[in-house]
């Protein structure tokens, strides 16, 4: 429970889509027929959504209901190749609820000429652009984030004040590329997702990137990375404490990775383990759960949401 006037909660990493029907690395991702809460994912059927979302629609309306109940004031909606490019739907979402959502656009980085897509996204009002860098490694090739066209896009984003949202591959795989991007575009605001992949070796190298002025870390996916522990995720708390020691609490933001993570836990549980932790101070919790994201993403007109008692209480 978040008491009145205590803190704003902002989710820095979530996903929305109306239907999955795409391919990545020549493998299919598609909403299942029948029970559409499941999807055929790469080589198996998985529970992609909570089992009661049987229409397969991961809509903003359902997410807002979860956000309101969990007292989450706003959310950043990012993108992933496995969901298909969702630019049209996400812009509709941002236009309908501008005070609740900041959405990320995404280009088809596998096809030359994507800089034109980036220019169009910026013209259409996207304030952030996403690269799922861990998906740029394919069976037969790897797309480098330091290619001439990528660097052209980053310079454009820097000049236009567009945020670069990125999920990196395990450990330090992409760190050298990121260092080059940061050096080349020092004013580019960067949010690194999945908390640096803290269950992999050399994950701290991703966190060290946040020692640069405009680089932040968000924790989207941290509960699935520590899923084997389950709630209250003591390993995740230890990772947060270690990250604080590396780059400071002011550079860290909470993210849920909704909706995939709530196939295992409730939406509130995806941050409640932080609220209840004795290993973090109240000031650290406030910054991590919302204050830092409010500053970084520029959320204005946020409102505090009331606590709604549930029928189990």
Regions found by a protein language model. Give the residues of each.
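Short amphipathic alpha-helices and their capping/turn segments at secondary-structure boundaries
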Residues: 1-9, 19, 115-124, 202-211, ...
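Conserved, mostly hydrophobic/aromatic
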Residues: 13, 67, 90, 121, ...
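Short, acidic/polar
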Residues: 56-66, 111-121, 202
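Catalytic pocket-lining loop regions of alpha/beta-barrel enzymes
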Residues: 127-128, 143-253, 295, 300-301, ...
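Mid-to-C-terminal alpha-helical segments outside catalytic/metal-binding sites
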Residues: 2-12, 19-69, 74, 241-242, ...
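Active-site gating/metal-coordination segments in enzymes
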Residues: 73-74, 81-172, 216-224, 229-230
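Histidine-centered divalent metal-coordination motifs
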Residues: 13-19, 167, 194
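Short aromatic-enriched loop/helix-cap "lid" or pocket-rim segments at secondary-structure transitions
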Residues: 20-25, 88, 116-117, 141-143, ...
